[in-house]
């Protein structure tokens, strides 16, 4: 089973009321939450760990997970409020205003870390949950605790505007977590933010030198690549009409993990010896699933039968 660990929040998405007025409607979201949902829909064994409120918005989150076949037994429930993000869409690109102080997600602490059964093979971490303490330190502690026995994957999903005034501490945390991870996923923009300018494969090999076994890089509408010490495999993206890009990278992550699960490769040994065929299958499922997500509004990952 793959345990996605990170933020769950309510996206307030812009809509138009029946009276023609501008309004916002609540939708379950969060980068890591979206990956858990996409994994469940793709038929992979998926579970989710996060701080989730007992309020009505928290119930929306829990119900949405259950509807997509995600195991919710590891949720750390509390009476703190739910994180809310108001979303503005301009030409399909999303910008966010976050309301996160004192929430169930942000205040997650190490004493809420679950004891995990042996059936959990893989931890997926990332997103804005790695920015603010105490939650960020809690997720890092979970990775540090379990990285010796379970596969861990990280996608920082970097939002430079969200880390203003915290960049040094954030870079240090991401550096530590990347070094512990078996699998790293970065957009081309994130890779440049972390490693500077240069050719993508060379920069990815710099990441590999820190400890990971494979780096997946998404290159927007062009496609995605997988880089190991000896491999550099690229798969072109499907051409689709883009409605918006919300959840695209999150869905890609799920496709990669689902494909690796299908190949029985989510073990420490398996991730260290991925074949060209397995990497190609992972890139293919990731890009195909993401193409469906961007072709419709919001983070609405595909079910397996849609592929």
Residue ranges and their predicted role:
Residues 18-26, 164-167, 272-273:
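Short glycine-enriched, charge-decorated loop/helix-capping segments at active-site entrances
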Residues 196-307:
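Conserved phosphate-binding/catalytic region of the ribokinase-like
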Residues 1-70:
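Glycine-rich phosphate/adenosyl-contacting loop at the front of the ribokinase-like
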Residues 45-128, 132:
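Conserved N-terminal subdomain of the carbohydrate kinase-like
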Residues 122, 128-205, 212, 222:
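Conserved beta-alpha-beta core of the PfkB/ribokinase-like small-molecule kinase fold
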Residues 45-46, 72, 150-152, 215:
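Hydrophobic anchor at the start of a short beta-strand
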Residues 8, 31, 128, 156, ...:
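Active-site metal-binding loops of divalent metal-dependent hydrolases
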Residues 101-110, 164-169, 271-272:
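Short gly/ser/thr-rich secondary-structure transition/capping motifs
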């Amino acid at each position: 089973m793959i345990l996605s660990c990170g933020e769950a929040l309510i996206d307030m998405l812009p809509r138009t009321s029946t009276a023609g007025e501008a309004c916002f409607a609540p939708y379950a979201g969060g980068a890591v939450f979206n990956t858990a949902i996409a994994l469940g829909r793709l038929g992979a064994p998926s579970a989710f760990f996060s701080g989730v409120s007992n309020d009505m918005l928290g119930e929306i989150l829990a119900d949405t997970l259950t509807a997509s076949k995600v195991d919710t037994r590891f949720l750390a429930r509390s009476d703190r409020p739910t994180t809310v993000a108001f979303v503005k869409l301009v030409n399909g690109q999303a910008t966010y205003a976050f309301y996160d102080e004192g929430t169930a997600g942000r205040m997650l602490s190490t004493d809420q870390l679950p004891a995990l059964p042996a059936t959990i093979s893989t931890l997926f971490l990332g997103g804005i949950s790695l920015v603010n303490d105490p939650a960020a330190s809690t997720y890092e502690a979970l990775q540090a605790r379990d990285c010796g026995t379970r596969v861990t994957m990280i996608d920082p999903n970097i939002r430079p505007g969200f880390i203003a005034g915290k960049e040094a501490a954030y870079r240090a945390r991401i550096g530590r977590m990347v070094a512990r991870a078996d699998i790293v996923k970065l957009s081309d923009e994130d890779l440049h933010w972390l490693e500077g300018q240069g050719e993508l494969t060379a920069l990815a090999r710099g990441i590999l030198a820190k400890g990971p076994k494979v780096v997946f890089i998404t290159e927007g509408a062009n496609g995605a690549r997988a880089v190991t010490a000896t491999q550099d495999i690229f798969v072109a993206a499907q051409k689709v009409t883009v409605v918006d890009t919300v959840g695209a990278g999150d869905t890609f992550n799920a496709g990669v993990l689902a494909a690796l699960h299908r190949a029985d490769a989510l073990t420490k040994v398996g991730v260290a010896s991925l074949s060209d065929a397995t990497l190609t299958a992972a890139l293919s499922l990731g890009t195909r699933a993401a193409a469906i997500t961007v072709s419709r509004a919001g983070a609405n990952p595909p079910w397996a039968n849609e592929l």
